[in-house]
Amino acid sequence: PKSLIHSFAILKEACAKANLHFNKISEKQCEAIVKVCQNIEDGQYLDQFPLHVWQTGSGTQTNMNANEVISMLGNEYAKENILHPNDTVNASQSSNDTFPAALHIMVAQKINEELLPQLDQMINQIKKLEEENEGIIKIGRTHLQDATPLYFSQELSGYRSMIEHS
């Protein structure tokens, strides 16, 4: 999916900066990798990633696809052959690490961009229901038996609180 490719670009950009910091690649190599990764993050070159997320092993195919695309486009950007898919773009990395890391980045982004806003909407809807049902008394239940009466709005506030504090 597009979001996985985006996450791989974020990861490869971060790795390039770390590899520059530790003198594993040159500044010119880092600049070329970062430029291509930022373009991929902006949605460019997605047609260069034909693989499906379902694949054998540890995601080696997607990792190598990313390395090769970044290397090819980075060399075009630098106007010279300074990047190699394994030796520079994939420096200090392993498919066993990059694929799970990219998945974690993708999931974290999806949680922040999609799940949390939906939970905020749910919380607001429950607050409205609490206000609309204020004063309505219902029988509490515990151990499949009747318990102390409570306001329906209190029960709703318990559900809301669980969502807010989870």
Where on the chain are the PLM-derived regions?
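Conserved, well-structured ligand/cofactor-binding cores
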Residues: 1-166
